[in-house]
């Protein structure tokens, strides 16, 4: 039985990448922009109902809730060729339409005011599921809506559905994208640490570099960057939608990648990559070639993260024409050449999931691969944002903007709490590189979490 997943798209960025994700899923499942299954896809062996349900007229509708505090992006979606794909009852645009002004506090406060309306949408989707497995959140952590509203929504979903999994696709900012983004990011990372089970980190700097260096796009647009993100999102859900023997549900995916509860931030790599399949560069894509390329720094979608540190886990989702006998040989070659450095206290192995390709898309290459990896070097992106926050906080820079919102009008305790959680997260990823990690934090009575605490998903039946 398929285990359904509800997607929540929050803010400008969250809805933009969500839109591209649904376009990609429609193509891969043979669903047209109106939600009608094409004749050639009627007898498919895929699991469309993980992410879609069928309306009374049998057209497919995404299990999605679209949320924004300003109307521009959702209006564009509603005017696009995919306008009739979504359930209009699951779209929320704030009546004031003014956005959150890049202020986490405003986004968080606005979410609190309308929580009943949003939770009603989510409950309705959950009630329409036979076996709900979890939630996916798409958002950015730099601005106001994706960060603040997204943070509040994470907390409420976690409270409301304590045994359901929560995975996020979180876009981390380009430098100086928003002047107060160090504050917004710190406050968001606290919620991602305490309320999500798995966070796929999408680094805008790395995505832009990949578009420029690998795809030869001099000035990549938001649409082109979002297309890269949608490719990663679709590939990461392939085993759920085209199930095989392993990793065919959310629990299986996350359990294989998250060895300890708080270290659940993943980086990705994808190869071969192109925005237009007609112009895919001609190359030989063997299983070994794809596996090696996925470990190359230039293909990692978090800037500089793998230059130092060690892998805690790797799952490669390989699609295409693969001879299963080549899997062991290729893994042995990678091990012999020491292409991946693993932590000393865990299994030093790359997990491989062989997944089916959509029969409805001609990709232009025989084999493609997605790497989902838990690497201690991910702390570098947290450290940059944390240091920026500390610099701002020492000067109380722009703090008056936040003091005007309800959550900060009496005190700044929320900043202090977030500071501690993020610092502990950075410290834990550093500690995970050492053999004595299992004893880390035992002597610190003030620790907010225990690295040996069982993950939520270990208790799900």
From Swiss-Prot:
This is Tubulin gamma chain. Signal peptide: none annotated. CDD domains: gamma_tubulin. One of its GO terms (molecular function) is GTP binding. Keywords: Cytoplasm, Cytoskeleton, GTP-binding, Microtubule, Nucleotide-binding. Belongs to the tubulin family. It comes from the Eukaryota. GO terms for biological process: cytoplasmic microtubule organization; microtubule nucleation. It is found in: Cytoplasm, Cytoskeleton, Microtubule organizing center, Centrosome. Tubulin is the major constituent of microtubules. The gamma chain is found at microtubule organizing centers (MTOC) such as the spindle poles or the centrosome, suggesting that it is involved in the minus-end nucleation of microtubule assembly. Pfam families: Tubulin (PF00091), Tubulin_C (PF03953). GTP binds at residues 142-148. Gene3D superfamilies: Helix hairpin bin, Tubulin/FtsZ, C-terminal domain, Tubulin/FtsZ, GTPase domain. The lineage of its organism: Eukaryota, Sar, Alveolata, Ciliophora, Intramacronucleata. PROSITE patterns: TUBULIN. GO terms for cellular component: centrosome; cytoplasm; gamma-tubulin complex; microtubule.
């Amino acid at each position: 039985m398929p285990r359904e997943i509800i997607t929540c798209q929050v803010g400008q960025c969250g809805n933009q990448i969500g839109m591209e994700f649904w376009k990609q899923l429609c193509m891969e499942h043979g669903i047209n922009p109106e939600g009608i299954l094409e004749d050639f896809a009627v007898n498919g062996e895929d699991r469309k109902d993980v992410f879609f349900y069928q309306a009374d007229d049998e057209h497919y509708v995404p299990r999605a809730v679209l949320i924004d505090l300003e109307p521009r992006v959702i209006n564009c979606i509603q005017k696009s060729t995919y306008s009739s794909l979504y359930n209009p009852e699951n779209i929320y645009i704030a009546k004031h339409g003014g956005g959150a002004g890049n202020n986490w506090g405003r986004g968080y406060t606005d979410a609190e005011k309308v929580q009943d309306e949003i939770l009603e949408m989510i409950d309705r989707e959950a009630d329409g599921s036979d076996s709900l497995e979890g939630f996916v959140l798409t958002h950015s952590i730099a601005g106001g809506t994706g960060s603040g509203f997204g943070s509040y929504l994470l907390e409420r979903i976690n409270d409301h559905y304590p045994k359901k999994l929560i995975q996020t696709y979180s876009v981390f900012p380009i430098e100086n994208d928003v002047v107060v983004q160090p504050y917004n990011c710190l406050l968001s990372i606290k919620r991602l640490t305490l309320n999500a089970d798995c966070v796929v980190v999408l680094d805008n700097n790395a995505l832009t570099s990949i578009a420029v260096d690998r795809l030869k796009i001099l000035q990549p647009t938001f649409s082109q960057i979002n297309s890269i993100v949608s490719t990663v999102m679709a590939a990461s859900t392939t085993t759920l939608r085209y199930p095989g023997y392993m990793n065919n549900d959310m629990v299986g995916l996350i359990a294989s990648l998250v060895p300890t509860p708080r270290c659940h931030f993943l980086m990705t790599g994808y190869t071969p990559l192109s925005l237009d399949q007609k112009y895919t560069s001609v190359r030989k894509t063997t299983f070994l070639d794809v596996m090696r390329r996925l470990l190359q720094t230039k293909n990692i979608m978090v800037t500089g993260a793998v230059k130092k540190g060690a892998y805690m886990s790797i799952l490669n989702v390989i699609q295409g024409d693969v001879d299963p006998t080549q899997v062991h040989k290729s893994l042995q070659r990678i091990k012999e050449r020491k292409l991946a450095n693993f932590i000393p206290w865990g299994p030093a192995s790359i997990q491989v999931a062989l997944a089916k390709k959509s029969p409805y898309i001609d990709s232009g290459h025989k084999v493609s691969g997605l790497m989902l990896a838990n690497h201690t070097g991910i702390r570098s992106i947290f450290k940059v944002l944390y240091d920026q926050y500390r610099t701002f906080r020492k000067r109380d820079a722009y703090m008056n903007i936040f003091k005007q919102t309800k959550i900060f009008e009496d005190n700044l305790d929320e900043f202090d709490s977030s500071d501690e959680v993020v610092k502990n997260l950075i410290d834990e990823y550093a500690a995970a590189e050492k053999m004595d990690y299992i004893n880390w934090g035992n002597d610190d009575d003030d620790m907010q979490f225990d690295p040996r605490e069982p993950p939520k998903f270990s208790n799900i039946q």
